[in-house]
């Protein structure tokens, strides 16, 4: 109820800003370079452990590795390396993601294409595109439910881990207006997801809100140079993928039962 009220108040506040959002969004799309998705969607981290783990990462542009050349240098590659060390397992990894996809599109366009039969854990990174398209929290939760069901139909035993929401309020390419409207909306999505998953078995959400200040302090990096975290003002840099993946690996390893 609290988050629905926050959303409704946000809509009321944002309505006069919609024309401005439209023109600012067009200007950002014109000025931000279109970066390709990362190459090589499969990999293997072999640390000579006695057993292997098979993981899938699923999602939007961040999981698709926009901002780096190869997935081994992006979120999934960094996640696999850190998980291998933390779980003492060799890691087979595979990426299923597409830039620009919402949760609904991932469910209908990507999940049916998954060919693997053996999967030990699944990581999902979503939220940005659903916020950019101004989906409501109600639709967001409905689409999340459909996504979870479609994955669990294929892999009923595999735990599912949702990453934090993207830190839209930190994107240097975005205007204050876009950060306010879209940034608040994606945080509502995160809160709604957290509440929903409390009653879900074997599905987890890392709910920490990402801030560059926290990341800089934890990793002894300068607070003054936010550009090191972004490849184009919107998508992560290789550094960001590594920091984000390492934190996600710590969260997963705290929940995962081999």
Give, region by region, the residue ranges found by the protein language model.
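Generic structural signal for well-ordered alpha-helices
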Residues: 144-149, 190
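Short, amphipathic alpha-helical "lid/cap" segments that border enzyme active or binding sites
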Residues: 103, 107, 141, 145, ...
């Amino acid at each position: 109820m609290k988050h629905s009220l926050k959303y409704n108040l946000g809509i009321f506040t944002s309505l006069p800003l919609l024309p401005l959002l439209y023109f600012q969004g067009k200007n950002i799309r014109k000025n931000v370079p279109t970066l390709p998705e990362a190459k090589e969607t499969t990999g293997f981290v072999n640390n000579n452990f006695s057993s292997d783990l098979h993981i899938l990462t699923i999602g939007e542009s961040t999981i698709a590795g926009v901002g780096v050349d190869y997935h081994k240098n992006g979120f999934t590659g960094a996640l696999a390396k850190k998980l291998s060390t933390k779980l003492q397992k060799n890691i087979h990894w595979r990426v299923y993601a597409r830039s620009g996809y919402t949760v609904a599109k991932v469910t209908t366009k990507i999940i049916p294409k998954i060919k693997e039969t053996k999967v030990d854990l699944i990581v999902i990174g979503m939220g940005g595109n659903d916020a950019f398209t101004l989906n409501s929290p109600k639709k967001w939760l409905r689409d999340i439910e459909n996504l979870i069901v479609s994955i669990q139909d294929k892999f009923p035993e595999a735990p599912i881990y949702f990453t934090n929401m993207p830190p839209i309020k930190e994107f240097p390419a975005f205007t204050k207006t876009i950060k306010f409207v879209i940034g608040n909306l994606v945080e509502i999505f995160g809160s709604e997801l957290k509440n929903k998953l409390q009653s879900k078995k074997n599905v987890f959400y890392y709910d920490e809100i990402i801030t560059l200040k926290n990341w800089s302090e934890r990793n002894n990096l300068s607070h003054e140079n936010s550009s090191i975290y972004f490849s184009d003002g919107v998508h992560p840099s290789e550094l960001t993928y590594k920091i984000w993946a390492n934190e996600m690996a710590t969260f997963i390893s705290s929940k995962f039962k081999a």
